[in-house]
C-alpha cells in the first residue's frame, strides 16, 4: 500500500501507473515487461486493472449507463460480444452481479452513472474491476464516500482477491485502511516514494514521520 497526505503526488503517480502519462524506460515493469510506454487499454490487456480516485469522467462516463460503463472497462470485451456484436444480455448479467455483490443502490443497470450517489458509484467501479480477477489491481481511495458496511465489503473483496494470488496496490489517505489491509507499506511525500516500512521494527511511528516529510529511506 501507499500512504500519504493528499497533494503529495498521488494523482501524478496514479496517472503514470494507469498509463495516462508515460514513464521512462525500465522504470515501470509488469511481469518482467517494460510497460512505461503502454496506454491504459494495453495495460488492461495484460490483466492490470484500475480504480481511480475521480469517479465521474475518469472512473466512469457520466452520461453512459452502468451497462455501457461495464463494457468500456473490458479491453477485449471478453464474453460480451458475438461476431462483433455486443451481447447486451451478458453485459447486463455482469452489471447485475456487481450491483448485487456490492450492494449498489440503483433501480437498474440501465441507469446513467451520474444518477448514482458517489458512494454507490464507487462500489460499482470497484466491483466492476474485481470481478475480472486481475493479476494486478490498483485502487485509489477504495472506500472514499461509502458507508461502514460497504467499506467492509470492499475491504473483504480486496483481501479475498489477494488470497487468490492477485497483487493489490492501494493508494489511500486513510492510514487505518492502509494498516489494516496492506502487508507492505510505502509513504508518498512531496512526490517521493519511501522504501517499504518495516512494521515490526519501526511501525506507525516511522510511517507518521514519513508522512510529514521525514527521511524517505
Each predicted region: which residue ranges?
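Glycine-rich phosphate-binding loops of nucleotide-dependent enzymes
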Residues: 1-217
Amino acid at each position: 500500500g501507499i500512504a500519504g497526505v493528499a497533494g503529495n503526488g498521488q494523482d501524478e503517480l496514479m496517472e503514470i501507473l494507469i498509463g495516462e502519462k508515460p514513464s521512462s524506460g525500465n522504470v515501470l515493469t509488469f511481469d518482467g515487461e517494460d510497460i512505461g510506454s503502454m496506454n491504459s487499454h494495453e495495460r488492461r490487456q495484460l490483466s492490470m486493472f484500475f480504480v481511480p480516485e475521480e469517479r465521474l469522467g475518469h472512473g466512469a462516463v457520466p452520461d453512459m449507463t452502468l451497462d455501457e460503463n461495464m463494457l468500456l472497462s473490458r479491453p477485449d470485451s471478453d464474453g460480451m460480444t458475438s461476431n462483433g456484436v455486443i451481447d447486451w444480455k451478458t453485459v447486463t448479467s455482469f452489471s447485475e452481479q456487481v450491483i448485487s455483490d456490492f450492494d449498489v443502490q440503483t433501480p437498474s443497470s440501465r441507469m446513467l452513472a451520474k444518477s448514482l450517489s458517489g458512494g454507490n458509484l464507487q462500489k460499482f467501479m470497484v466491483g466492476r474491476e474485481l470481478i475480472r480477477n486481475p493479476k494486478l489491481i490498483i485502487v485509489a481511495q477504495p472506500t472514499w464516500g461509502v458507508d461502514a458496511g460497504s467499506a467492509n465489503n470492499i475491504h473483504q473483496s480486496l483481501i479475498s482477491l489477494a488470497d487468490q494470488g492477485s497483487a493489490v496496490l492501494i493508494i489511500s489517505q486513510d492510514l487505518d485502511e492502509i494498516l489494516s489491509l496492506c502487508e507492505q507499506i510505502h509513504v508518498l511525500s512531496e512526490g517521493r516514494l519511501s522504501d517499504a516500512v518495516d512494521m515490526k521494527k519501526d511501525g506507525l511511528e516511522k510511517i507518521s514521520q514519513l508522512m510529514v516529510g521525514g527521511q524517505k529511506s
